[in-house]
Swiss-Prot record:
The gene is hyaF. Not known. Could enhance the incorporation of nickel to the hydrogenase. Belongs to the HupH/HyaF family. It comes from the Bacteria. Residues 1-21 are annotated as: Disordered. It holds the Pfam family HupH_C. Keywords: Nickel. It comes from Escherichia coli (strain K12). InterPro entries: HupH_C_sf, HupH_Hydgase_express_prot_C. This is Hydrogenase-1 operon protein HyaF.
Length: 285
């Protein structure tokens, strides 16, 4: 058989197409992973910290907390070795939260690589006030802080400014949904609207600053800031290659992208059980 046929196709056999392009794969994609068992083997730890993990795993296997509730174990009194062991085991997942509390303390919350498990630490200055491991759709401090903001009144509307296009009707739409919980969740997608910088400034003045900042990672990054209005969040999604992807106002108790799904909690309970079993088998006798 002639070899000519086999040279009609393949690399280098076709003319270049200058118009061809391919979107590069996102370089910011991160997914949950298993804890490094090799690293855990090198971490000294006490039976106390293993008992805490077993307690949380048992609670989670018996009962999945409903929205607004969590299961928790206290880590505040762990020694330095146990704290390092917990840090190695939990790692860092996709969601980070920072909350400025009314008493001038600050809550720092990091989702673990076990989706729906949250490391919750509260500090005042250099002093650590709380250190907990929580299991739930969202950490308790976030649920509590998200319901403390103001409800709107008509007097909240800031005076009009030059350059407004859609700011005023968007403000009325936003306030109408905040006042009516049955109309939530609701999203106002600024990316798909003709909107000016004056509109953005007007809406920002309407909502005011909040005390919660959230960052999520995955395909790009999302920055979600609470506003001064209850259940109103300003969301910006970016991609390191393409820049801004989405800007919106979300009217809801907590944006869905932050929440762990029930099936995530089931999976994390199973994975945590496997880790606890491995630790028990690896323990010296």
């Amino acid at each position: 058989m002639s070899e000519t046929f086999f040279h009609l196709l393949g690399p280098g056999t076709q003319p270049n197409d200058d118009s061809f392009s391919m979107n590069p794969l996102p370089i910011t994609c991160q997914v949950n992973d298993e804890p490094s068992m090799a690293a855990l083997e090198q971490c000294a730890h006490s039976p106390q910290v293993i008992a805490l993990l077993n307690e949380l795993q048992h609670q989670l296997s018996e009962r999945q907390p409903p929205l607004g509730e969590v299961l928790a174990v206290d880590l505040l009194n762990l020694n330095a070795d146990d704290r390092h062991f917990i840090n190695t085991l939990l790692g860092e997942g996709e969601v980070s939260v920072r909350i400025q509390q009314a008493d001038d303390s600050e809550s720092e919350i990091q989702e673990a690589i076990f989706c729906g498990l949250w490391r919750v630490r509260r500090r005042r200055g250099e002093k650590l006030l709380e250190d907990k491991l929580e299991a739930g759709c969202a950490p308790l401090a976030l649920w509590q802080a998200a319901t403390q903001n103001l409800l709107p009144t008509d007097s909240l509307l800031p005076p009009p400014i030059d350059g407004l296009m859609n700011g005023l009707p968007l403000a009325h739409e936003l306030l109408a949904h905040v006042r009516n919980p049955d109309a939530q969740p609701h999203s106002i997608n600024l990316t798909q609207l003709p909107i000016s910088e004056a509109d953005r400034l007007f809406l920002s003045r309407l909502c005011g600053p909040g005390n919660i900042q959230i960052r999520t990672i995955g395909y790009g990054e999302s920055y979600i800031n609470a506003t001064g209005l209850r259940h109103v969040w300003h969301l910006r999604c970016t991609d390191t290659l393409k820049g801004p992807l989405l800007e919106s106002y979300e009217i809801c108790p907590i944006p869905e992208v932050v929440l762990a799904a029930p099936e995530d909690l089931v999976d994390s309970a199973q994975r945590l059980s496997e880790v606890c079993q491995w630790l028990a088998e690896a323990a010296p006798t």
